[in-house]
Curated annotation (Swiss-Prot):
Aspartyl-tRNA synthetase with relaxed tRNA specificity since it is able to aspartylate not only its cognate tRNA(Asp) but also tRNA(Asn). Reaction proceeds in two steps: L-aspartate is first activated by ATP to form Asp-AMP and then transferred to the acceptor end of tRNA(Asp/Asn). This is Aspartate--tRNA(Asp/Asn) ligase. GO terms for biological process: aspartyl-tRNA aminoacylation. Belongs to the class-II aminoacyl-tRNA synthetase family. Type 1 subfamily. Disulfide bonds: none annotated. Keywords: Aminoacyl-tRNA synthetase, ATP-binding, Cytoplasm, Ligase, Nucleotide-binding, Protein biosynthesis. It comes from Desulfosudis oleivorans (strain DSM 6200 / JCM 39069 / Hxd3) (Desulfococcus oleovorans). It is found in: Cytoplasm. The gene is aspS. ATP binds at residues 228-230, 237, 489, 541-544. PROSITE patterns: AA_TRNA_LIGASE_II. The lineage of its organism: Bacteria, Pseudomonadati, Thermodesulfobacteriota, Desulfobacteria, Desulfobacterales.
Length: 597
């Protein structure tokens, strides 16, 4: 039998009382973190989202209340009335904000019991993530999780505060929209009242926010849920949140300035740290040349170096052959790492294979020259040229990649990050923001054998590059920009196309016939033909930003109820089969049995 609250109402949180509160009668409510019986006196650590307060049940003062406290167990929900007392000097707990006081209980209500939890409600737990997600309501009681979700709340409040102060309007856009199959797969929602037709859940509010600019709202924002049916990684979820914004009558610098101000306010409100403005800038071409990735981590200095010209005529067929086939050769100098073991070198070779590299050549620089299986293939002049360009010194370890540019950049760029972590070169306490600009408009899809938009087809191209549209599409740069924090993309955007004729040209360059793009995007073209202002915007990955500010490695740690790596909810067992009646109403027939292996 459990109690009711009765007339007791909480007066303070469990992190609010101090020595100055001594003598005050208070009412606290929360969960039992721990119960201890010391020679008849029962001590209970009472926990709520704010912290912990020690409650004392003394048999000499309140025998009936003390007797009732014998029934208390971990995670019981209780309400306690009592008087705040200073602890004896030898019992002060400096680890608690409330460590100078305790509450001497005079009344106790056991509001609910609790079965033994699957794991302790504390930060240091040795339990699998699957069990944590299955019992998320228990997992979320842990201080670390409560701290993360509080940080998420503060980040959202800070974003709204800043954007409101800059004249942005918070406007909602539809979740049920039309399917426009570009990029990642859409989640489809069948329409009962329109048999055979489907809505799509939005991957972003992109087209609707452009409509709002055409409608004259000037500045829009939304902290919005988006959906993508794609394979998951540590920083991806099928449903995710972004801070979305759009502005009229602007160029890149205007949008980027707003983005910097927003991020600075979020960081200050969440971490208390100031951010140096403006952020660093780097073009896409520069990022790829020096770091191999379009989201470089600038917290440590280790650049890729192109040696294609030196390798072109060398005797090592792997290098010269790659150049002959239109590829490149790059090198990465890991200073002072010549003592890496063969096992470590083999591990790195396996690592770059993830990024389609077919091998990893290396050279250790010793007092007596190069130590490497490939040393014999190079002339003294070639060695001297590489040594000078790569700043090679005794004790260095140099890695080489030779293949198509995309493979070399991807493999060595990620190897750079891995070695930086391995050597402890990454300053974990530093936040390094970077704008990457001037992305290619197109990227070639080897699978579909056609060009696709690198960002999305509504991004404006650089006007000066339009002459290359049909002769050299890869030379066309977009007016796009990504914001990178410590090697992770946290936001991206662009100036949009606001002219119908230009938009149609870009659709056609992507291989869409007029009847196709009119069917899919006719409403956008009509809007662009109805007085569309120049406009641009961006979106921030809210989950990812909060993850980085909290020092976590997965966005699942900053989302209350995340999906698993298989896009499932371990708590509710979603997705689940629908019954036949529901499917019949939707004119859907399931042809595969999901219960079969």
């Amino acid at each position: 039998m459990v109690d009711t609250l009765g007339n007791m109402r909480r007066t303070h949180t469990c992190n609010e009382l101090s020595a100055a509160s001594a003598g005050t009668e208070v009412v606290l409510a929360g969960w039992v973190q721990r119960r201890r019986d010391h020679g008849g006196v029962i001590f209970v650590d009472l926990r709520d989202r704010e912290g912990i307060t020690q409650v004392v049940f003394n048999p000499d003062r309140e025998p009936a209340v003390h007797a009732k406290a014998h029934d208390i167990r971990n995670e019981y929900v209780i309400c306690v009335k009592g008087k705040v007392e200073k602890r004896p000097d030898d019992m002060v707990n400096p680890k608690l904000t409330t460590g100078e006081i305790e509450v001497a209980a005079s009344e106790l209500a056991i509001l609910n019991t609790a079965k033994t939890p699957p794991f302790m409600v504390e930060d240091r737990i040795d339990v699998s993530e699957s069990i944590r997600l299955k019992h998320r309501f228990v997992d979320l009681r842990r201080p670390a999780m409560q701290k993360n979700l509080l940080a998420r709340h503060r980040a959202g409040m800070a974003a709204r505060e800043f954007l409101n102060s800059q004249g942005f309007l918070d406007i909602e856009t539809p979740f049920l929209t039309r399917n426009t199959p570009e990029g990642a797969r859409d989640y489809l929602v069948p329409s009962r009242v329109n048999p055979g037709a489907f809505y799509a859940l939005p991957q972003s509010p992109q087209l609707f926010k452009q409509m709002l600019m055409v409608a004259g709202f000037d500045r829009y924002y939304q902290i919005v849920r988006c959906f993508r049916d794609e394979d998951l990684r540590a920083d991806r979820q099928p449903e995710f949140t972004q801070i979305d914004l759009e502005m009229s009558f602007v160029g890149e610098e205007d949008v980027m300035a707003i983005g910097e101000g927003l991020v600075a306010n979020v960081v200050r409100q969440v971490t208390g740290e100031a951010v140096d403005l403006p952020f660093s800038r780097m073009t896409y071409d520069q990022a790829m040349a020096d770091y191999g990735l379009d989201k470089p981590d600038l917290r440590f200095d280790m650049k890729l170096v192109d040696i294609t010209d030196i390798a072109a005529g060398c005797g090592f067929q792997v290098f010269s052959g790659a150049v002959k086939n239109g590829g490149i050769v790059k090198a990465l100098n890991a200073k002072g790492c010549a003592d890496f073991t063969r096992k470590e070198l083999d591990d790195y070779t396996e690592f770059v294979a993830i990024y389609k590299a077919r091998g990893l050549a290396w050279v250790k620089v010793r007092e007596d020259g190069w130590q490497s299986p490939i040393a014999k293939f190079f002339t003294d002049d070639e060695k001297a040229s590489m040594a000078q360009r790569l700043n090679m010194a005794v004790g260095d370890l140099v890695f080489f990649g030779a293949d198509a540019a995309s493979v070399v950049n991807d493999s060595l760029g990620n190897l750079r990050n891995r070695i930086g972590e391995r050597l402890g070169l990454v300053d974990k306490n530093r936040m390094c923001f970077l704008w990457v600009t001037d992305f290619p408009f197109f990227e070639y899809d080897e699978t579909e054998k056609r060009y696709q938009a690198k960002h999305h087809p509504f991004t404006a191209p650089h006007e000066a590059d339009m002459e290359h549209l049909h002769t050299d599409p890869e030379a066309v740069r977009s007016r796009a920009y990504d914001l990178v924090l410590n090697g992770t993309e946290i936001g991206g955007g662009s100036i949009r196309i606001h002219n119908r004729q230009v938009q149609e040209k870009m659709f056609e360059a992507l291989g869409l016939a007029p009847e196709d793009y009119t069917a899919k995007f006719g409403f956008l073209l009509d809007a662009l033909d109805s007085g569309a202002p120049p406009h641009g915007g961006m979106a921030f990955g809210f989950d990812r930003l909060v993850m980085l500010l909290c020092g976590e490695s997965s966005i699942r740690e900053v989302i209350a109820f995340p999906k698993t790596q298989k896009a499932a909810c371990a708590l509710t067992d979603a997705p689940s089969p629908a019954d036949k009646k529901q499917l019949d109403e939707l004119f859907i027939k399931v042809t595969a049995d999901i219960n079969k292996e």
